[in-house]
Amino acid sequence: MKDTIRQLIQQAITQLVTEGVLPEGLTPAIQVENTRDKTHGDFASNIAMMLAKPAGMKPRDLAEKIIAALPAHEDLSKAEIAGPGFINFFQNTQALAARLDAALGDDHLGVRKAGPAQRTVIDMSAPNLAKEMHVGHLRSTIIGDGVARVLEFLGDTVIRQNHVGDWGTQFGMLMAYLEENPITSDELSDLENFYRAAKQRFDESEAFADRARGLVVKLQAGDPDCLELWTKFKDISLSHCQKIYELLNVKLTMADVMGESAYNDDLINVVNDLKAQGLLVESNGAQCVFLDEFKNAEGEPLPVIIVKADGGYLYATTDLAAVRYRSGKLKADRALYFVDQRQALHFQQVFAVARKAGFVTHPMEMEHMGFGTMNGADGRPFKTRDGGTVKLIDLLTEAEERAYALVKEKNPQLPEADLRSIAKVVGIDSVKYADLSKHRTSDYSFNFDLMLNFEGNTAPYLLYAYTRAAGVFRKLGKDFSEVGGQIELHAAQELELAAKLAQFGEILNNVAEKGTPHILCTYLYDVAGLFSSFYENCPILAAETPTQMHSRLRLTELTRRTLKQGLELLGLKVLEQM
């Protein structure tokens, strides 16, 4: 609806330019927002205040002329001036009701992508292998998954790329430690403790560290024995990751793994191509690219190091190879990198070098979707009591156990199997939603008590709202397919819920554009709150007439479907009963 209003305003401005009321050459960014008080309309624009000065008119006078020039539209009943010059737009309730009825007959709930479908690469999760995933991997994994799901729902071809750290010193450490301490494959499955012991030896013994580095050199040279061990370590580590992805209900598979090692053969080509273009400069023995737009605090050029003085490659080298692959081989139109925002400068430099070097052969928009840190209650990065890194599996297990205690307290009569299955959904959903509901770029404090609360913007609250809507049809004893009639909007609670449901497509397009799932979380929370008000104030099964009951059942069903679809796009599971 907002896009429709923007188009109508643009047509009115064009008309006023033709009439000489407005000067030529105006290209205003037309803003249309939802109103808070629906008695003053459903949407508002400040366009008259933006253009009053170039028009040489008072905002309210210009607003009058814009309203007079607005083309009629069936979805709008009227437009009015408010305050110093706002233009408020009122939806046609009959047209709104018809749109919602149409959404009920559409698998996509009437949602369409605002622009053309694209091929989009999602760079997400990307843990360093050789050890288990920890809480620091949660945000990239679930935010990337949520955005990928939304883009797919809107019609994009999404290519997930799990750029795991599967190459480097850590594998030399593991191989050196295995030489000293031969163990069975079963013992090796406890990779975390094995890695910790190897790291301790690496830090304490220079001789061990030298052996580890030597094994890395052999690995890079293609030594068969080293490659066999490396493959074993990698497979064990990836199997750990896959269990986490399945537990988190994240759409990542082994087929999506495209780790650092996948680009090894192209790294020398990256270096040679940069050299051939005269972009590589030697600095303190390292091969670097200097770009004018990157300088340090003293105004000196910042290097993008491509090859270290010892001949080793860096993340930038691999990322440049990945850019070239994603543009040239995958033919992506857009590449979204869900990586900690502390890597912002790194990606700015990589993207700039890639463009300068012509590595983006297929037009591809590259965006670093940086995110903030998950902190403990003290506001510091989340750690164990002894200061160690919290394993992701331990966090999720604790979430399930806490949810189990909560569900059992509220429903002690439920069978044990039901308690466990409900607790698993509530626990995992709560951890994910607590993260996804925060702005992507913000830090936040992890708090089990808040995220498992049945009040406020939490997963349990939304799950309950969904089961409440689904419960209406259980009480009715009929499936929705048996419900006829059409939506009619009269009560204030009906109108407010209907207007919010009609915004679903706009919300999803915002998530797709900005890579910010919290927008969808806020929307679903609003829908749940408005449905609660509707449920309490507008009798559904006890409606005054069959026509009214059918209308309210249809609103309830659209609410149920919207909540379910929205939660599933966030990667959350729903419960039919709690």
Swiss-Prot record:
Q: Name one GO molecular function term.
A: arginine-tRNA ligase activity
Q: Which organism is it from?
A: Pseudomonas fluorescens (strain ATCC BAA-477 / NRRL B-23932 / Pf-5)
Q: Which SUPFAM superfamilies match?
A: Anticodon-binding domain of a subclass of class I aminoacyl-tRNA synthetases, Arginyl-tRNA synthetase (ArgRS), N-terminal 'additional' domain, Nucleotidylyl transferase
Pfam families the UniProt entry points to? Arg_tRNA_synt_N, DALR_1, tRNA-synt_1d
Tell me the gene name.
Answer: argS
Q: Which GO terms describe its biological process?
A: arginyl-tRNA aminoacylation
Keyword DNA repair attributed: no
**Which catalytic reaction applies to this protein?**
tRNA(Arg) + L-arginine + ATP = L-arginyl-tRNA(Arg) + AMP + diphosphate
Q: Provide the Gene Ontology terms for cellular component.
A: cytoplasm
| Family statement drawn from the similarity comment of this UniProt entry | Belongs to the class-I aminoacyl-tRNA synthetase family.
Main location class: cytoplasm
Q: Any idea of its EC number?
A: 6.1.1.19
Q: Supply the name of the protein.
A: Arginine--tRNA ligase
Q: Where is this motif: 'HIGH' region?
A: 127-137
Q: Quote the subcellular location field of this record.
A: Cytoplasm
Q: Does the keyword Coiled coil apply?
A: no
Taxonomically, the superkingdom here is: Bacteria
* This protein's UniProt keywords: Aminoacyl-tRNA synthetase, ATP-binding, Cytoplasm, Ligase, Nucleotide-binding, Protein biosynthesis
Subunit-level organization: Monomer.
NCBIfam families given in the database record: argS (TIGR00456)
